[in-house]
């Protein structure tokens, strides 16, 4: 049984009654960097109780209510602007954790509008100390090979960052750039005269084997994001970035949340696990993601083409 988001009625700012999706888990956001550029917007909409999304093709509005939200997963390359507002989520008993992408492509200027790498490393450490290392997941994503940046150079850069993040996170997630399947990215790199090299099974395994050795020092969980290649022999798993098992582990005292992740629905009962049992095996996998994505169902509240990092 595929779990679906609940629907509720809300009153909009202009007094209209409309139907809204009321997700348990919010993704903020795969589509844009809300913490870096839209923290105030996010908090203002949280205070209002809902946000509006517009269909990019016909501009038709749809509404997302925060009435039942228990967890927000933030995706970002710079969470610093959001940090002062985290107390507002805590005051509303809304849990959260971060997918923090911390790459090192400064020389190549692939991410032209992000802070310098040392500043990002310090922000990572500060956030980890504030909310706990289990809630800040390090992403080196994607791994990009070029004529000048081969496997050894990528490993050197990952090692440099990893050595500084030791003790400040529990997990490293990475993916291999599949540039030829993303025409816009390929066109951008060609325009910049960047000679990129797509990964193959041999180069992916070469990188993963060396990363396995580096990780003997860090002792992190290693995982790939939406990759088909099997690297389990190197103790590298397929990731769930919006991770139901992680949510259960770190927010174990939220009975409604645990009930949703077990039965596919929330409960207002006082007992942790009421007598009802699922009639069928529930499917919490997000049906709107790629084939090899293991994410738990969520609702993304970002808008495409609004990210100001201007990544190539």
Task: Locate predicted features.
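A C-terminal junction/extension of Radical SAM enzymes
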Residues: 202-294
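Conserved C-terminal portion of the radical SAM core fold
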Residues: 119-186, 210-229
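Short, surface-exposed amphipathic charged segments that create phosphate/polyanion-binding patches used
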Residues: 113-115, 186-189, 237-243
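Short, solvent-exposed loop/turn segments at secondary-structure junctions
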Residues: 33, 79-80, 103-105, 143-145, ...
